[in-house]
């Protein structure tokens, strides 16, 4: 079924974003509709509004969010109504040679889900019925969103959704840099330049990895206090 709700939209590059009422279509095969509980604000959202990330407006912003499944489309078996999920803003088909090799971040089908669901038909429209693009296949700076299950990860319902939202980008980017890029080992000395949302999660990741010493550098004293 269709639903209406508020969303944050970039209508024009280098102009203030606007909050509008939008219409969200119900899920098709392999999709679910979410009630969004919380959405982080990432620097990538800013980059989409100024053209640094070249995605065409009108664009519903937001790619790191958490919410509850309220409707499931045909063929969905991995999620059910009532499940809590976080978004995954990098689409993966699960079938190409990179996905099959355990490197889904390099999925050759990513381009299918940059501004629409991977099937290619917009699920999000403005009040006049005109289609809206969605940022990185998500567009979750909104009250509702219909997404492919490939863009979602089920989580424990005990996890507060306002905290879980950050796992969609800030946490995975920071912790992933520690374990997958730098490959920090126990006893390492780690320097972290910048203590924003990602930097703080690099620090946490380094701690989990067993770093002997973590050096945090920031331009604002308030961030170091955290």
State each model region's role.
Residues 1-4, 27-28:
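Extreme N-terminus of proteins, especially the signal/transit-peptide cleavage junction
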Residues 6-8, 18, 23, 35, ...:
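Residues located in well-ordered beta-strands
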Residues 23-24, 56-62, 132-137, 143-144:
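Short Gly/Pro-enriched turn/cap motifs at secondary-structure boundaries
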Residues 25-39, 49-100, 105, 113, ...:
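Glycine-rich beta-strand-centered segment in the early N-terminal region that forms part
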Residues 89-150:
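Cysteine-cluster motifs in flexible loop/terminal segments that predominantly coordinate metals
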Residues 144, 150-152, 156-226:
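Mid-domain Rossmann-like dinucleotide-binding core that forms the NAD(H)/NADP(H) cofactor-binding site
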